[in-house]
From Swiss-Prot:
SUPFAM superfamilies: PRTase-like. Pathway: Pyrimidine metabolism; UMP biosynthesis via de novo pathway; UMP from orotate: step 1/2. Its EC number is 2.4.2.10. This is Orotate phosphoribosyltransferase. It catalyses: orotidine 5'-phosphate + diphosphate = orotate + 5-phospho-alpha-D-ribose 1-diphosphate. One of its GO terms (cellular component) is cytoplasm. It comes from Colwellia psychrerythraea (strain 34H / ATCC BAA-681).
Amino acid sequence: MKDYQREFIEFAIEKQVLRFGEFTLKSGRVSPYFFNAGMFKTGGDLARLGRFYAATLMDAKIDFDLVFGPAYKGIPIATTTTVALYDHHNVDVPYCFNRKEAKTHGEGGSLVGAELEGKIMLVDDVITAGTAIRESMEIIKAHGAQLSGVLIALDRQEKGQGQLSAIQEVERDFGTQVAAIVTLGDVVTYLEEKLEGKVANQPELAENLASIKKYRLNYGI
């Protein structure tokens, strides 16, 4: 695990984006952790978030021409990622996002930003069922562009209804690569390191770690 990945996990915990406990998911599963990127909600949060996305994108070495953020959570992510790419990596790329409802006045249309063309890097917070990716693929195809890759914050590494994760299904169905700032495995490693580094007893930390490991045995890939 790289330093920026540890920093991202600490950042997510600090901002209560990553929380531990018992959370009932839409699938009905009771998860020992919850990730809500909507809790990144200040200018400073977004600036830091963009740096993590940009660093991961540079590490992934996926060729792309444009960053696309699906409405709604993908919009600020696409914006801050492209700013960070320019500020920290001297890479200046266009970005674009869609409206949920097309405008019928003014400039009109369902897209805002640059022309949706060439090789597209789609950015979002997580992939749960892959629905947003499939909807975005329809938009990308309609404009004659191609999906080059997908970048998300957290890979849950969790099976869907079958044996594959939602991410593996996206990679299979669209022949594309999905990169993540961190995986659930990275979170486990982070917690293990924290536990080993503490002299004092950390029952809550140990309990969270044990719960996640048990959950992974049942639902992990």
